[in-house]
């Protein structure tokens, strides 16, 4: 009986550290500047990517630059990076090189962000609250690597680490979904209003994650929706 109870305690502890759950209407909250607060995510798909779409909500309260979404491999720490640079705007990196979408200031309200890229053309898209920015091109012919370390709240300057508090997010992140293809404009707008098209890399409704440091799970602050998954 004692051995059974010990095994049960280990199982409970493991399930709390490595969640795999429906995060609907919840958000990760990063309440302060830190080099130790972050969330690591485990991808459902382990294969190389010839295209991707990442969508999420972000609500930040910092006047400096910060990381929004960091996807590192052992050969490229900025394999995929979504980053806000103060006074410049949003940048999207693929395989190291990055491209900038100009903006004078970060929105003060929760913002829905979608970033897409495809290897065949190198076309990069950035959507903010269902509205597209001008398309740009980056890393045509590149293939995004496997065995990724995916981090929310920090930028990785090494695989799974190398964090800098001056690049940390202070605020909320939620509704994080990722696909291994480029969503159509109609699909991106549908995701913005609450529908989800079977994410096959990261799925907010069946998320594998681990929190580190002062990160909390709280109800989301952006509009609630009751749309069903397609």
Swiss-Prot record:
Residues noted as binding Ca(2+) 2 in the record, renumbered to the chain: 155, 157, 167
Residue span, Pentraxin (PTX) domain: 24-223
Molecular function as annotated in GO: calcium ion binding; cholesterol binding; complement component C1q complex binding; identical protein binding; low-density lipoprotein particle binding; low-density lipoprotein particle receptor binding
Needed cofactors: Ca(2+)
Range of residues in the leader sequence: 1-19
Glycosylated sites: 147
Protein name as catalogued: C-reactive protein
Lineage, broadest ranks: Eukaryota, Metazoa, Chordata, Craniata, Vertebrata
């Amino acid at each position: 009986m004692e051995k059974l109870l010990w095994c049960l305690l280990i199982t409970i502890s493991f399930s709390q550290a490595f969640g795999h759950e429906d995060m609907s209407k919840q958000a990760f909250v990063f309440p302060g500047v830190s080099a130790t607060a972050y969330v690591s995510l485990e991808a459902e798909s382990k294969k190389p990517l010839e295209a991707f779409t990442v969508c999420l909500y972000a609500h930040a309260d910092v006047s400096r630059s910060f990381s929004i979404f960091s996807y590192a491999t052992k050969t490229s720490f900025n394999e995929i990076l979504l980053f806000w640079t103060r006074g410049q705007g949003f940048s999207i990196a693929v395989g190291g090189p990055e491209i900038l979408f100009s903006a004078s200031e970060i929105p003060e309200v929760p913002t829905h962000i979608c970033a897409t890229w495809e290897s065949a053309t190198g076309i990069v898209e950035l959507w903010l609250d269902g509205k597209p920015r001008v398309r740009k091109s980056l890393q045509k012919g590149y293939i995004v690597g496997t065995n990724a370390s995916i981090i929310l709240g920090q930028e990785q300057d090494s695989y799974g680490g190398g964090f800098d508090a001056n690049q940390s997010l202070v605020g909320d992140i939620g509704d994080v979904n990722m696909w291994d293809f480029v969503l159509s404009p109609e699909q991106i707008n549908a995701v913005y209003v609450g529908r989800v098209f079977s994410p096959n890399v990261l799925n907010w409704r069946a998320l594998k994650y681990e929190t580190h440091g002062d990160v909390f799970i709280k109800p989301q602050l952006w509009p609630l929706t009751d749309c069903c998954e397609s």
